[in-house]
Amino acid sequence: MEEFQGYLELDKSRQHDFLYPLIFQEYIYALAHDHGLNRSILLENVGYDNKSSSLIVKRLITRMYQQNHLIISVNDSNQNPFLGHNKNLYSQMISEGFAVIVEIPFSLRSVSSLEGKEIVQSHNLRSIHSIFPFLEDKFLHLNYVSDILIPHPIHLEILVQTLRYWVKDASSLHLLRFFFYEYYNWNSLITPKKSISIFSKRNQRLFLFLYNSHVCEYESIFLFFRNQSSYLRSTSSGALLERIYFYGKIKHLVEVFVNDFQAILWLFKDPFMHYVRYQGKSILASKGTPLLMNKWKYYLVNFWQCHFYVWSQPGRIYINQLSNHSFDFLGYLSSVGLNPSVVRSQMLENSFIIDNAIKKFDIIVPIIPLIGSLAKAKFCNVLGHPISKPARADSSDSDIIDRFVRICRNLSHYHSGSSKKKSLYRIKYILRLSCARTLARKHKSTVRAFLKRLGSGLLEEFLTEEEQVLSLIFPKASSTSRRLYRGRIWYFDIISINDLANYE
């Protein structure tokens, strides 16, 4: 935030919400590509930083000054005089700068709203792994869970209308429409499935901003019981996920509820309702009855459609009983099961056998989807049999091993919280043998002969750092070592889902 305040005349911007002139300032583009704004962890530039320079930025600004309007036809975009020969580069640079500009009002409001409030500031709570200790603590006492697929707007103009509440500069909103129509397949912008449009791939920062502003709109309904929620929020998509920014919207929602929904306000008084979200999926769990969960389901659908104009269907919300259902979230399969235990109690001459069943939150790695992800990445076939990677056969041996080891360690690091490690051992086996097949193919040898020549060195490379430390401290055969290998570990440095663990 200090970087923004150092460069911008914030008092003027705050009074008039007039942001459009900032698009002509060179330092905006410097901020857009500055890796010191705590953004480098979340977003990586998409390969044009080597082409961007102060000279290109100045040339771009000169062209914008000379052009009287920003009108573009999708059919005639290749000959647009505003963009010229460097259409893709210039358009991408403008969109990156524009993303910085429209974030300013939200950043200012976040700073002012956080002042004087006691909110957990630990960076550890940014980790998406912090969600699982929260689930372990809360879900053992709940009965039902709803898997919610996030609804999408009927038309992208709704995204522009959403921003009008915060950005009151008409020129900036027109520029946003310009970017929507600049790219083909723009209707797939919000689609979280396989092929996100060219727009979202080449304009990641702007895409995440729009997506989160859209999600926070309909998510603001849950602010009514935010006092019962945990501060373990995922901030992997940026600071916009902090719902504290939307106090203005709450005021409006209170009026709506009081006037139109007085009869159903009791729904919000459930102290055992908990909500978590990541990307396009959210989980809503409660200790209530099936009737209460179904009322929530149809109420949310109608509320989103009538007041936020987002298309949703009851079929996108799945209600299940926690005791006999496993829900897929963040690459893990989670469930609440009963762990039976038998206790023998003896009092004088009489003895009793007491059966106890303790609830246990079980988290495992779904092996079939993970093998499917590895098969898509050409590490194995659909049955899980390792295959070689011919695309990497031209690299050096050390480079090939490093790449496989990095993938293996990242997966082990991400899935370290699994209750059962057998799935991880199988994944390690697939990656290790795929690496050996790739190297053997490169050297025109058999896998057996290559592994015999390489010895145990390849196996040691695939050990994670924590396994290497434990192997030095404890003997492999000791019970302490085995318990630590099997133990569940959550790492608070993970702020985004692993690509191979993202099965959507």
Swiss-Prot record:
Which InterPro entries does the protein's record reference? Answer: Domain_X, Maturase_MatK, Maturase_MatK_N
Q: Which GO terms describe its biological process?
A: mRNA processing; RNA splicing; tRNA processing
GO CC terms on record? chloroplast
Task: Kindly name one Pfam family recorded for this protein.
Answer: Intron_maturas2
What subcellular locations does the record give?
Plastid, Chloroplast
Spell out the HAMAP family in the cross-references. Answer: MatK (MF_01390)
Spell out the family assignment given in the record's similarity comment: Belongs to the intron maturase 2 family. MatK subfamily.
Q: What is this protein called?
A: Maturase K
Q: Could you tell me the gene encoding this protein?
A: matK
